[in-house]
Amino acid sequence: MGGLSLLQLPRDKFRKSSFFVWVIILFQKAFSMPLGVVTNSTLEVTEIDQLVCKDHLASTDQLKSVGLNLEGSGVSTDIPSATKRWGFRSGVPPKVVSYEAGEWAENCYNLEIKKPDGSECLPPPPDGVRGFPRCRYVHKAQGTGPCPGDYAFHKDGAFFLYDRLASTVIYRGVNFAEGVIAFLILAKPKETFLQSPPIREAVNYTENTSSYYATSYLEYEIENFGAQHSTTLFKIDNNTFVRLDRPHTPQFLFQLNDTIHLHQQLSNTTGRLIWTLDANINADIGEWAFWENKKNLSEQLRGEELSFEALSLNETEDDDAASSRITKGRISDRATRKYSDLVPKNSPGMVPLHIPEGETTLPSQNSTEGRRVGVNTQETITETAATIIGTNGNHMQISTIGIRPSSSQIPSSSPTTAPSPEAQTPTTHTSGPSVMATEEPTTPPGSSPGPTTEAPTLTTPENITTAVKTVLPQESTSNGLITSTVTGILGSLGLRKRSRRQTNTKATGKCNPNLHYWTAQEQHNAAGIAWIPYFGPGAEGIYTEGLMHNQNALVCGLRQLANETTQALQLFLRATTELRTYTILNRKAIDFLLRRWGGTCRILGPDCCIEPHDWTKNITDKINQIIHDFIDNPLPNQDNDDNWWTGWRQWIPAGIGITGIIIAIIALLCVCKLLC
């Protein structure tokens, strides 16, 4: 009783203390502890770089699960490299996690592997598991392998992303992408009486009529899948293959496929024809495409740069078994052909162009055998391409090729249109400047120019180009599909329309700032990346590491954007300064010449009263501000020697809460004392 008597308070003081306790409790409810997450759509780039904490997690409804692709971190996406990241294990049950949104995938995979005895290596997909919905290229591989295990897992512990479902195992015959699962904290929406609640889509639902995209399929055959030494063959048609022995890009395979069809280097028997790539051939064209070829637009695989050479002919003992016969060959690289030999030496002053009456249909990228191109769009997109197919006297003949992607997939067994006799001449794919140069008058040295004649007008559609290319739906629509950096992430998770952005063509393999998101229609905006749940077959840290790679890619993209903006502003400042200087000099010169008539203003009147103001200091200050706030600021310290009291401000709400709890306990003891 002696101890309790010390806690007794007068009735008026008790009321004041109780009121103070309730105020503290309500204050703690209203101001929760921050979780260290980037905040709303109005954040600045410096806030992202410094990871400023401004938002609070009030409820679990603010969390949104997002699938992040590993290719955004710069991993190799070709089939030989990707298969080395997958392995079979037994005794580990698969895990499936649902997520709500995800990135656009540049490369997806589809596997159908059998054991030597003919049984399936991979399990069938469970009910509700559908293919990844946004794939630019689908690498469809068939083959055999030992498959030493029940399931195929990711060796690094990553997920295999399907349609709104992420699994730790590969399922048979379903498109998937490699990735991890992260969570975004969304800004809490403000609810009003006049605003209806948002309509949420089902978790496993991806239909979005506003998104148009093209998916291309590349087919492979793999021998000894899952083993240390395996063989991968790229399928041109049912009997023609290319052995892949180095990292490559899908763009290289597409160019190679068209070149083999163009040179008619297909198997002309029922046996197999396997081509091997020479070591000098560059297989990295179009790296980091992400819906656009941004590495080097002039770096293409042209037909005249390759030569085909037969190596050996291996036949079985039974000559009648033609189907088992294998012919081998090599695709070599040779010097680039000069286009000057296309112009005749004894040509007149003008080389006219005309379109021949008979069109020659060449195997285009959408009509070749061995792959299918499916376009999921409600529109029909047509493009006419022009290609020089040979010379005829003093005229260059151009054959128009119509490319019309349709919503249905072109079967791989479709026959190739037989070329006309004109197509037997050496075929050359030329770039725009090379072809247009032939329209100018050309006179051989040492010869007198002949009489000038008018060239016939070349009437072609406006969209005629000089190279056959795949027409993507997003190239013909005003609303693009590419979103990048933080603005793209925040906008793509909301209801705003996305716009396409041209990115740097010199992006290295370690930095890929192009993150493209597909998502259900939500009214929320993404606030930032918070944390990743720990799932997987047991590789520690893979998910956190994967998220940090993607976050670093965002920071890398922002820094790269700031560098480019600063350089552009500096060039613009230099140009405007020089232009202002030249303008003032010219004005003085004109005034000097017109001084006998009273000068320029006496002649022009009030129209000459224009002063080229000097804004150099303003632009320089803005450039220095960008450099100071964004480029020169170092990244947060990644060392592990952080002081335990570094974030002491974050302990203030916790201290207030603990103090409130202690006071509440004391108040309850006082109440009990009074009642007793």
UniProtKB/Swiss-Prot annotation:
One of its GO terms (biological process) is symbiont-mediated-mediated suppression of host tetherin activity. The record marks R501, Q502, N637, Q638 as: Cleavage. Residues 33-650 are extracellular. Residues 305-485 are annotated as: Mucin-like region. Residues 405-428, 449-461 have a biased composition (Low complexity). The keyword rRNA-binding does not apply. The chain crosses the membrane at residues 651-671. Glycans are attached at N40, N204, N208, N238, N257, N268, N296, N314, N366, N463, N563, N618. Residues 33-185 are annotated as: Receptor binding. N-glycosylated. O-glycosylated in the mucin-like region. The record marks L57, L63, F88, K95, I170 as: Involved in receptor recognition and/or post-binding events. Residues 1-32 form the signal peptide. Residues 672-676 are cytoplasmic. Residues 524-539 are annotated as: Fusion peptide. One of its GO terms (cellular component) is host cell plasma membrane. Keywords: Clathrin-mediated endocytosis of virus by host, Cleavage on pair of basic residues, Coiled coil, Disulfide bond, Fusion of virus membrane with host endosomal membrane, Fusion of virus membrane with host membrane, Glycoprotein, Host cell membrane, Host membrane, Host-virus interaction, Inhibition of host innate immune response by virus, Inhibition of host tetherin by virus, Lipoprotein, Membrane, Palmitate, Secreted, Signal, Transmembrane, Transmembrane helix, Viral attachment to host cell, Viral attachment to host entry receptor, Viral envelope protein, Viral immunoevasion, Viral penetration into host cytoplasm, Virion, Virus endocytosis by host, Virus entry into host cell. Pfam families: Ebola-like_HR1-HR2 (PF22307), Filo_glycop (PF01611). Disulfide bonds join C53-C609, C108-C135, C121-C147, C511-C556, C601-C608. Residues 554-595, 615-634 form a coiled coil. Residues 337-373, 404-461 are annotated as: Disordered. A lipid is attached at C670, C672 (S-palmitoyl cysteine). The mucin-like region seems to be involved in the cytotoxic function. This region is also involved in binding to human CLEC10A. The coiled coil regions play a role in oligomerization and fusion activity. Belongs to the filoviruses glycoprotein family. Filoviruses entry requires functional lipid rafts at the host cell surface. Essential for infectivity, as it is the sole viral protein expressed at the virion surface. This is Envelope glycoprotein. It comes from Sudan ebolavirus (strain Human/Uganda/Gulu/2000). The lineage of its organism: Viruses, Riboviria, Orthornavirae, Negarnaviricota, Haploviricotina.
